Amino acid sequence: MASYTPGTYEGAARGYGGKLFVRVTVSEDRIEAVTVTQHKEYRGIAWGLNTTPIERYPELIVEYQTLNIPVVDGADLTCAAILDATAAALKAAGASKEDIAALRAAPAPKAPEYPDEVRTVDVVVCGAGAGGLAAAIEAKLAGADVVIVEKQGITGGATARSGGKLLGAGTRWQKKQGLFDTKDMVYDYLMDVGNRSGKFMDASKNRYLVDHLNQTLDWLTSIEATVKGDPMQVLAQPWEPLSRPVEKDGVLKTHFDVLDVEPIHVSLQPWRVHNSPGGGGQTNGEGGEISTPLTLYYENDLGGEIIYDTAMDEILTDEAGAVTGVTCTRKGGAKLTLYARKGVILATGGYARNKDMVARYPVAHYFSNVPHGNVGDGLTAAEKLGARNYEHPAVQVVYTSLTNGVGINDESGLIVNNRGERVVNEWSYQYTVSDAIARSGSNCGWYITSGKEPYGGVQYGYKAAVAGKSKDPCAASIEGLAKKMGCDPATLQATYDRYCELVERGVDEDFGKPAEFLHPIKGPKFVALRLHPCVTVTFGGLETDISARVMKPDGSVIPHLYAAGEVAGTGMYGTQYPTCGTSIGSALFYGRIAGRAVTDQALL
């Protein structure tokens, strides 16, 4: 049994978003209270839900007197941070290394033991990301008995880990900022970008989506969700001002709102990317501002059921080929069979975590920040029924530094592929740059700099490389740099010499970059910041019609099977991601369509 000096102690550890602090009160031999006092973790991943660890872990530590708490799948880093910070506080209270080791090995809360089970409901939704939540809400509002099956211990899917951006077309937020935009302008932009490298775009589905972009935003902002829990603890979380709960009739309510509108890229007009609360420029962690209110509304206000930690295995059909339900496996191995009277909606996400599926693209050694469960299982399950899975010739890939963020902002110095060749106007939308690198057959990019460009990330990366504090190569010559990069010195030297010539002339004859972004690279030290491929959104997916029904190659539909979100092929991508906000916006819209179609409601 551990021995402590009675009192209250502080501890800290690094979480997903930064340092996390706890306050622990102990008696001589017990942990009496644990409170997370400060953190920078993300809403919808670490906190804000009925299942997130910042709400659950402190009381479990106290109740079971253990640091051996089961991980909330999807929030692994936050779970570890709470336990490590608590251990640090206990050490300050006098616990020995042996005491801490014993607490980490102490009996964990017993996992629920589920029997094999067979149930019948109206609608089964597989996946609780943006598309699945929107579908479930629409079906529930129509009076259907709905169950969501979710692999993780939290909702949100890839949306919760995203920057939380949404696409709009002439919205009230754009007008407030004096921005002129129309649905036709957005439609033309999407079709132009998507068809630059081939005829990939589905005109009818894109028209349908764009015509309802603003309605989707209005629907999302209209939802008021009940927040449960002790009000003092709830309000102690790091809420963004726009989503901070307010009391209505004795109940705390939260909702989604748009903070502001930002450009797709500084080179592109008009501005049409709508930011979640949390501010513009973010590339991850703010998407929980979208998924959390949807989850709370579905669970707390509509009484909807989510079966967590449960993976869909197989889609069931009758003799005529109509879908009748799914089989699933719970954590622990219990089998769950769910029959669906009205239909099954697949919202299982993409396949960015399936290395075999991504292997056909030139993105070897890629990384991804999407949930580990995004392995394309919805695609393969539907394919077994004869569904058409369109294997698109591209995925969303952005080449970015893992240490300084260069590649995802507006840096516009010299970028080369892994052979040392310049292949693009660097002052372009990041996905245009990435698409050019990928299409050149390169599985990485390099940002060549002498640290003089006016970009914080570049200067940070340059200084770290010069000081030997990073793995990015540094050399006194371009030839020496090329050797460290692993490319042909003559090729990189020729590229560098040509670039310097264009800088001197003030005209980019090769790729048309504006003169003010032709930054000189003169040494005395040269650094190459490695840009790694990051895969997030995957293109293609199950062919669906305008009602979100899953189709076969012959154009017929599979009765009672629907798809929304990344698993669905919405016909809206070419070889590059057109703009932030496209994926979440289409997931919400076609999720709503699926939820309405499966319950025989009029479409939007």
What kind of region is each of these model predictions?
Residues S3-A106:
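Active-site- and interface-proximal helix/loop "cap" or "latch" segments in soluble metabolic
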Residues E63-L67, G168-L209:
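Glycine-rich active-site loop/strand segments that organize a redox cofactor
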Residues V118-I148, T599:
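N-terminal Rossmann-like FAD-binding beta1-loop-alpha1 element of flavoenzymes
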Residues Y208-A334, V503-G523:
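Conserved redox-cofactor binding core of oxidoreductases
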Residues K331-T400, I584, I593:
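Glycine-rich loop(s) and the adjacent beta-strand/alpha-helix scaffold that form part
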Residues L379-E383, R388-P489:
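An anion/pyrophosphate-binding glycine-rich loop and adjacent beta-alpha core
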